[in-house]
Amino acid sequence: MSWRTKLTWKVEWDDRARKELRKLDSPIQKEILSYLRVRIAGSKDPRVFGQSLSGNKAGLWRYRIGNYRLICRIEDHIFVVFVVGVGHRKEVYET
């Protein structure tokens, strides 16, 4: 017998990332949240839309939303994309 259930990805936020999101303008916040809801949470593999990072951020993934970036950790075993950073592309990699 073969069966398949549709598993969706859950997006969770680090407290610092949530604070960074609140500092952004409202239209940018909405665009980021919409991107996460439509592209990431609804996908079979969230890696398709992102790019893996290297160096001191190895193991993390980044997602481009205009001039803004989401830095995330993907937890395959529990189907969670954990947002650890969000900000303008010139600043988000500094921390």
Model-based region annotation:
Residues 1-15, 19-22, 27-30, 34, ...:
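Enriched for short, Lys/Arg-rich terminal
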Residues 38-62:
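A short, surface-exposed loop/turn module that caps and links secondary-structure elements
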